[in-house]
């Protein structure tokens, strides 16, 4: 077979792609850092996170009480708060600073602060305030303290309304405090727990973040090992853009296709979270999501000069990305700029789509906007990755003292293969 024939070039390109795949796959399992982020963290971290929030609710959360009012109403507030199943008045402090020290020592998870003018304002018919300070390192304790304080305040407000309503019968009092009777029935998150609300989004975010960490760390290793400190080594097997992009992408797709099914199907079942996922829907959904994450990571890998840099670029973005999806913070309250900025990341549409699939039993037709957005991101980031790797390939050739004519000839040959 002539080396100049199109068939030979295609076969040679496929062979080089398989060689790159084999090399990258071997590096994933030999590099301890990449192995940890691409294999061990996706396997272990979801189990730890799910175990923490498996109970859905916590009981008897320790709370410090700062009562500067010392009135009948403030004592009623504290008594009702302590009688609730979710919170417990553990310490009584004389000042807010004393209560803060207890929070710093982890003796309590929150503070109830009742100011000195609390009862005075109530007697004047003015609005009184009760301060609630919560430790947000664990959302379950924050939820228990905040909702308990809110419930007690609503109960006291009802008593004040009854006393000022002037009703003659119990029915009059009921109408005063609750003019419209309603039953609150949770439709999807039946446990009204933090795990069912947030965990699906966290699982999908873990896929993206660990993938970015793994790809970035592998890119940093490549630069450190290559003699010219370039992302792409000078080798006959790394002679074309498509073979490099597809060879690298195949590695992470094979790994994360398995991990994606593990995170979306196995982990929720292990811990009894609400999961209405079907095989066909999740397979169709994970395909564009994993591909968009891969090409997004490969595109950003050109920014990584050293292995440690990727930690600074990725880790600190996890919490903001989760907030910008709108599952833990109302999407309607997110400014338009940040909503537009969140569209850059595949996790935004991935989390929104998977949450509807997992909690609401949605099909691909029901999440069509997110599904289309992921495919658009896949196409855009694939083209961007090809452009970035083309520039990296030319830079590596020139630094290796290859003439511009040789580089141009190889590029023309690659274009023939690509057009064929």
Locate the predicted segments by residue:
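Extracytoplasmic/periplasmic domains immediately adjacent to an N-terminal transmembrane anchor
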Residues: 1-196, 366, 391, 397-420
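Loop-to-transmembrane-helix entry motif
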Residues: 28-35, 206, 247-253, 257, ...
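Membrane-spanning alpha-helical segments of multipass transporters and channels
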Residues: 48-49, 70, 91, 254, ...
């Amino acid at each position: 077979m002539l080396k100049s024939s199109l068939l030979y070039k295609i076969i040679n390109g496929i062979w080089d792609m398989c060689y790159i795949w084999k090399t990258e796959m071997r590096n994933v399992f030999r590099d301890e850092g990449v192995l940890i982020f691409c294999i061990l963290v996706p396997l272990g971290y979801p189990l730890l996170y799910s175990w923490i929030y498996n109970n859905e609710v916590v009981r008897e959360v320790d709370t410090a009480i700062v009562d500067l009012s010392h009135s009948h109403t403030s004592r009623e507030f504290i008594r009702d708060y302590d009688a609730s199943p979710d919170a417990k008045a553990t310490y009584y402090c004389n000042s807010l600073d004393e209560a803060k020290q207890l929070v710093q020592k982890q003796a309590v998870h929150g503070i109830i602060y009742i100011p000195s003018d609390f009862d005075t304002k109530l007697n004047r018919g003015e609005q009184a305030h009760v301060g609630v300070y919560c430790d947000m390192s664990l959302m379950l304790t924050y939820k228990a303290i905040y909702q308990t304080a809110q419930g007690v305040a609503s109960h006291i407000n009802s008593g004040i309304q009854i006393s000022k309503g002037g009703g003659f019968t119990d029915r009059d009092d009921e109408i005063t405090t609750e003019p419209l009777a309603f039953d609150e029935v949770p439709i999807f998150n039946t446990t009204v727990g933090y795990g069912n609300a947030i965990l699906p989004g966290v699982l999908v975010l873990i896929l993206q973040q660990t993938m970015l960490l793994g790809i970035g760390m592998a890119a940093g290793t490549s630069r450190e090992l290559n003699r010219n400190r370039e992302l792409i080594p000078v080798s006959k097997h790394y002679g074309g853009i498509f073979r490099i992009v597809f060879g690298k992408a195949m590695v992470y797709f094979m790994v994360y296709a398995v991990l994606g099914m593990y995170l979306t199907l196995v982990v929720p079942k292990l811990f009894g979270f609400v999961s209405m996922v079907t095989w066909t829907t999740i397979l169709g959904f994970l395909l564009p999501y994993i591909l968009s994450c891969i090409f997004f990571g490969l595109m950003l890998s050109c920014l990584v000069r050293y292995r440690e840099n990727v930690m600074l670029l990725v880790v600190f973005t996890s919490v903001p990305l989760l907030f910008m999806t709108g599952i833990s913070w109302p999407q309607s309250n997110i400014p338009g700029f940040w909503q537009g900025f969140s569209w850059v990341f595949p996790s935004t549409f991935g989390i929104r789509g998977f949450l509807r699939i997992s909690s609401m039993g949605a099909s691909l037709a029901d999440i069509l906007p997110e599904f289309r957005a992921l495919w658009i991101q896949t196409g855009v980031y694939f083209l961007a990755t090809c452009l970035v790797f083309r520039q990296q390939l030319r830079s590596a050739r020139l630094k290796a003292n290859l003439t511009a004519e040789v580089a141009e000839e190889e590029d023309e040959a690659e274009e023939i293969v690509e057009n064929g």
